Amino acid sequence: MAIKSVLYDKYKKDVTKSLMKEFNYKSTMEIPRLEKIVINSGLGDATSDSKIVEIGLKELHLITGQKPIATKSKKSIATFKLREGQAIGAKVTLRRENMWNFLTKLISIAIPRIRDFRGLSTKSFDGNGNYTFGIKEQIIFPEIVYDDVKKLRGFDITIVTSAKTDKEAMFLLKELGMPFVKTKEAK
C-alpha cells in the first residue's frame, strides 16, 4: 500500500471544494488536477567529461526517488564539441504518489531554503495551465549532501495540470501552497 501525501489529502478535501466554488464547475470531473511533474537538468559540461552525466543522474535520483533518463543531443555541433547522440542532460517524469511526495517536499522543505527568496514568478505559465520555473542550486534539497557537491547545478521544474487556463492553474497551485510573488493591488 502506497503512502498518501498530506498535500494530496489537502487537494481532495479542501482544494477541490474551493475550485468548485471559485470557478462554478458543473461536474467534479472539470476540476483541474496535477497530471505530472517533469524535472529537467541540462549538463553543459558533459561534452568534456562523461562522469558529469552520471553525477547529474545520481543527484536527480536522490532528489526525486525515481530513476532519471539521460537526454541526448539530436545533432552534432562542432563549435560546442557536441556529437549526435551524446548524453548532455537528465530528465525525470513524476506521476501519482511520487509526484505528490515530491511536490510536498518542494513546497514545505526545498523552496524555503532558497537564498533571498521572495516568491515564484506568476508570469511563468504557458497559456495552457502549465507552470515552469527554475531552481539554481540542487543543494536546497535535503537529500543532497553539500560536501559531496563538486559543482552547483540547477534544473527546470514543469508542473503539468489539466487546467484550461492559467488563472485556474494559478488558483490550484496557490491553494496547494505554492509561494507566488505577492502582486501590488490598486488601493
From Swiss-Prot:
MF terms (GO), sorted A to Z: rRNA binding; structural constituent of ribosome; tRNA binding
Disulfide bonds: none
GO annotations of cellular component type: ribonucleoprotein complex; ribosome
Main function: This is one of the proteins that bind and probably mediate the attachment of the 5S RNA into the large ribosomal subunit, where it forms part of the central protuberance. In the 70S ribosome it contacts protein S13 of the 30S subunit (bridge B1b), connecting the 2 subunits; this bridge is implicated in subunit movement. Contacts the P site tRNA; the 5S rRNA and some of its associated proteins might help stabilize positioning of ribosome-bound tRNAs.
Identification of the protein by name: Large ribosomal subunit protein uL5
Quaternary assembly: Part of the 50S ribosomal subunit; part of the 5S rRNA/L5/L18/L25 subcomplex. Contacts the 5S rRNA and the P site tRNA. Forms a bridge to the 30S subunit in the 70S ribosome.
Keywords: Ribonucleoprotein, Ribosomal protein, RNA-binding, rRNA-binding, tRNA-binding
InterPro entries: Ribosomal_uL5, Ribosomal_uL5_bac-type, Ribosomal_uL5_C, Ribosomal_uL5_CS, Ribosomal_uL5_dom_sf, Ribosomal_uL5_N
Pfam families reported for this sequence: Ribosomal_L5, Ribosomal_L5_C
SUPFAM superfamilies xrefs: RL5-like
BP term (GO), one: translation
PROSITE patterns: RIBOSOMAL_L5 (PS00358)
Family matches, as Gene3D superfamilies: 3.30.1440.10
Protein origin, superkingdom: Bacteria
Membership in a protein family: Belongs to the universal ribosomal protein uL5 family.
